[in-house]
Amino acid sequence: MPVQRSSRRSSASKNGTTKRSKASPKSRAKSPTRTSSHSSTTFPTKMKRILTFLLKTCLGLIALFLVISLLAVFAYKWVPVYYTPLMVIRQVQGVEARGGGWQHRWVPLDSISPYLPVAAIAAEDQNFLKHNGFDYRAILDAYEEAQEGGRVRGASTISQQTAKNVFLWPHSSWVRKGFEAYFTVLIEWMWSKQRIMEVYLNSIEMGPGVYGAEAVAQEYFGCSARGLSRSQCALIVATLPNPLEYSSKHPSRYMRKRQRWIEVQMRAIPFLPKEEKTSQKP
């Protein structure tokens, strides 16, 4: 009899083992379903983390750009501009002044002939003292002229040209135009009109490898920027649309014609007022 009980227990244990062994494949069959469900939930989580990281990175870069640009414009309210992106680009392109390299000598506005700002305003931006950086009337006129099939002409103000010359690259694009508008707003807000004109006349390209009023006066006319005559100032400004093609040292007939036109326009332009007589900007 005890032997029979033992055999029954043995058979029962075998049956239990068999049942458990039969049940294990089912549990193993269910595990892939749980793994698949887990992976399907982690994928959106990973994507969310990646997108969050990218968003934070973009916002950080934008904030960094805003801080650096504000500090740069604020510093240039007083600090002379000795180098511009265009100077570096021209150097890489091999455009050099006589004797190699570039010629650039910063001088304060008081050391520049008073006729040069007048000539620049007459030729480039006759509403310079009135607008806030953008001449909307000139922009509209240029747009309407282009729509009517006329020649495409620029409507950039002296403020816009200064922003481009000091902070940006020369090649035109919608991206650069956007940055140009941003920097134009900043310099009009932080700088006086006199400071904008001072930076403009000291940084603008006036010949191959020649930048600024003092450099062009010494290189082409053998005098200081203060000693430039009225007609010489008009001739220098006449080259500004394309100073690599037009030369104030060897002017063509077209250049002489443009010089005379600028001198006529200068009669209606007053001298740039002293900064003390204008409202100070922050």
Q: What are these model-derived regions, one by one?
A:
Residues 2-282:
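Juxtamembrane regions of bacterial inner-membrane/periplasmic proteins
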